[in-house]
């Protein structure tokens, strides 16, 4: 699903050059994500970092005739990570291990938490003003990890920290179009809450399909919430949702850059430091946000919910609060 903003990414003119860094560029998400960013004409300086493979990916992409320069960095060279990050405008973090059959996003926490923490610390040192887009799962916990690291370093800017939840929205659009036999490019489904299982709440009642039968709706909601499992199973242990996630990450990155450029009405969902349920001890929440030159301009209210969605929200908040606390406590304990 390409929004108007996403389509504008492929225009041939560049008004503002942006430096973008991908941390974990050699992985299953990192490689296709880097390709899509190479094709985005808002990006003129693309830096790719990984423990291995980043230089090969960068060389491969450098043959594509777009107006961006691409360079790979590894920890083997002096200041490799620092040079990949220095003065960059945007950092995308898809680094970490992928899900395997039987694993949940939370099962990834033990491995990915330390990876994200260390990359956040490096970003705080070398690119304290950059927008940070967290893709590494579990996003419900890794975003709070990044926030806590930035706070400890004294450079936390809640307007520039994003958990990328776009995949939930594009899945919702695609899946609802299959059920209702509509054009998926014309579907827009607000998905709120978090980015795993029951914390994912697609607001079907706010679409044109509110009269869908209960059975259809329940099946649709479950598929949106657990769509990642569908891919993990289909790949038979060989990976997770890498290609669709790369598309989602590139789509959201383009939206952030469009906001930086001052384009109007750039609205995308994201898991952010949010006031919506702070009074209940929930510091982060996914909802539509308006993006502008300084990052988040406005966090939109979730609107009117059906009774079913209200019930889903209550269950979401219980789980989400624990997920967030898990991330915060991880940083505090180290």
UniProtKB/Swiss-Prot annotation:
Name recorded for this polypeptide: Malate dehydrogenase, mitochondrial
Catalytic activity line of the entry: (S)-malate + NAD(+) = oxaloacetate + NADH + H(+)
Binding site for substrate: 99, 105, 137, 171
Positions of NAD(+) binding: 24-30, 50, 112, 135-137, 245
Feature: transit peptide: 1-17
Pfam families (alphabetical): Ldh_1_C (PF02866), Ldh_1_N (PF00056)
Biological-process GO terms, alphabetical: aerobic respiration; malate metabolic process; tricarboxylic acid cycle
Enzyme class: oxidoreductase
SUPFAM superfamilies from the UniProt entry: LDH C-terminal domain-like, NAD(P)-binding Rossmann-fold domains
Keyword annotations of the record: Mitochondrion, NAD, Oxidoreductase, Phosphoprotein, Transit peptide, Tricarboxylic acid cycle
GO molecular-function term, one example from the UniProt record: mRNA binding
Modified residues (Phosphothreonine): 199
Residue numbers bearing the Phosphoserine modification: 177
Active site: 195
Miscellaneous comment: Yeast contains at least 3 malate dehydrogenase isoenzymes: a mitochondrial (MDH1), a cytoplasmic (MDH2) and a peroxisomal (MDH3).
Lineage, top ranks: Eukaryota, Fungi, Dikarya, Ascomycota, Saccharomycotina
InterPro entries, per the entry: L-lactate/malate_DH, Lactate/malate_DH_C, Lactate/malate_DH_N, Lactate_DH/Glyco_Ohase_4_C, Malate_DH_AS, Malate_DH_type1, NAD(P)-bd_dom_sf
Assembly and oligomerization: Homodimer.
Organism of origin: Saccharomyces cerevisiae (strain ATCC 204508 / S288c) (Baker's yeast)
């Amino acid at each position: 699903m390409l929004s108007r903003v996403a389509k504008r990414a492929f225009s041939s003119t560049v008004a503002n050059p942006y430096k973008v860094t991908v941390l974990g560029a050699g992985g299953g998400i990192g490689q296709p994500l880097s390709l899509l960013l190479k094709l985005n004409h808002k990006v003129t300086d693309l830096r790719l970092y990984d423990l291995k493979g980043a230089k090969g990916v960068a060389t491969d992409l450098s043959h594509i005739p777009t107006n961006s320069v691409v360079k790979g960095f590894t920890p083997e060279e002096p200041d490799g990570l620092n040079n990949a990050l220095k003065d960059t405008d945007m950092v995308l973090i898809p680094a970490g291990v992928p899900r395997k059959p039987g694993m949940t996003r939370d099962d990834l926490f033990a491995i990915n938490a330390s990876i994200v923490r260390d990359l956040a610390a490096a970003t705080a040192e070398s690119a304290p003003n950059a927008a940070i887009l967290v893709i590494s799962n579990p996003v419900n916990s890794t975003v709070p990890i990044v926030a806590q690291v930035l706070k400890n370093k004294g450079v936390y800017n809640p307007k520039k920290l994003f958990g990328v939840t776009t995949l939930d929205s594009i899945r919702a659009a695609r899946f609802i179009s299959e059920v209702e036999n509509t054009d998926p490019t014309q579907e827009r489904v607000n998905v709120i809450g978090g980015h795993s299982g029951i914390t994912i709440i697609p607001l079907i009642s706010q679409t044109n399909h509110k009269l869908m039968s209960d059975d259809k709706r329940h099946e649709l909601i479950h598929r949106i919430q657990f769509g990642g499992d569908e891919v993990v199973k289909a790949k038979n242990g060989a990976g997770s949702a890498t290609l669709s996630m790369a598309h989602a990450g590139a789509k959201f990155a383009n939206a952030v850059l469009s906001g930086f450029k001052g384009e109007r009405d750039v609205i995308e969902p994201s898991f952010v430091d949010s006031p919506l349920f702070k009074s209940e001890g929930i510091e982060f929440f996914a909802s539509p946000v308006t993006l502008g030159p300084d990052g988040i301009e406005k966090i939109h209210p979730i609107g009117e919910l059906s009774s079913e969605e209200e019930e889903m929200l209550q269950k979401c908040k219980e789980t989400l609060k624990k997920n967030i606390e898990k991330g915060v406590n991880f940083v505090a304990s180290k």
